[in-house]
Amino acid sequence: MSMFEDLPVNVGIIYEGERIRGRDMQVELGGPREEHKFELVRSISLDEIVDGKVTVIGKDLSELPVGTNSPFGIIISVAGKELETDLEGVIERRLHEYVNFVEGFMHLNQRYDIHLRLNKKSYEKGLNSFKVLGEILMRLYKSEMSFIEKIQVTFITDPEKVKEEYEQAIKIYEHRDSRARGMNDSDVDVFYGCSLCQSFAPTHLCVITPQRYANCGAISWFDGRATSKVDPKGPVFEIPVGECIDENTGEYVGVNKVIREKSLGEIERVQLYTAFGYPHTSCGCFEGCAFYIPELKGYGVLTRSYRGETVNGLDFVTLSDMTAGGRQVDGFHGISIEYMRSPRFLQADGGWERVVWMPKLIKERITGFAPQEMLDKIPTEDDVSNLDDLKVYLKEKDHPIVHTWTEEPESQKEITVPQLELPAELLPIQGLPSGMGFTIILKNAKIKAEKLIIKSNRGK
């Protein structure tokens, strides 16, 4: 049953997690094809808002050609006597949840990476104007966040206006992110958990600390504190830290307890500052990811905005598939830009001394936070294009990773795998003569067996 019977499409939690494929798409808003897209919540005074007003700047949904994509911005202005500026980021993040409540609407990512799709069926049912979406969002916000007394929504598809407001939004995001810098995890006895993405990754939970932003890059420790106070039963909540098991890896008794509960026992331990062992899980909304390059014993890092291939031939979509889903996969680690600015970034793995490649856009955004002497030794896509060139570059720059190469990198070595023989008794096979024995040989085994040979051992 829909939450709002007077609207042309259903609205409810049942639609959260719905995926819309290209062939079913009426229109795409933002996404990887568009340079400029954003979502922003601003807290302003009560007398500045016309409560319930929805404004469209540019083409409305009915004016956008079928199957096309458009630059997109959404600005939500809120006001209330109890509304703090600290709540802006969390109210903003709720857009991910609320848009996905709408039948036939898909919302992915956050901030300047948003990606929305509307399907044809919902459009034909009457969701053919941003006015309808705006009405839904305003009702959801007011019904779940009682501290919002007034709200108005502005949708933007005009390319020039999107670009103008996008540039302002970037400045606001940066101001928010700067608040927690200088704080240490050891300064607090409470972290925060965020389960907003569990509709897409049921076993995932973000652990937010002063030195580890949410993977999406949209929720800081201060944001978590503010929202848990006004909405204690909501998707952002306190995590009592408890005893520190290992300060280097970032493992805590309290975090493990909550992770086990929220993942229904699927994830038992999490270490916040390593990509191996028990790494922090990821949904698909992370700003970027760190990926291990075994040939060089180091990490590459990239963000969603990078369009090309990495130095080992993978792209963001491929790496995202390997990283996301609420799993713990050694060597694949969902991260935010702000976490890359943290002194605890991949701390247990060697930090920036283990990073061997990144796009130049990331290098620009973390300059002034990561050690400059290391940034000077880490190449970008402008410097190298394959692993052989990367190896040469690292040697020329005397990158610290070079001193860990006690022998040739793995790709240069001939790997020999001993034959594995299993007795036939361990492999009962129906339909074969009794008394026949077999030898099972796995040749060139790595992760998968290249060849399976079954030999008869008659007479032995």
Residue ranges of predicted features:
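Compositionally biased, non-globular sequence tracts
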Residues: 412-460
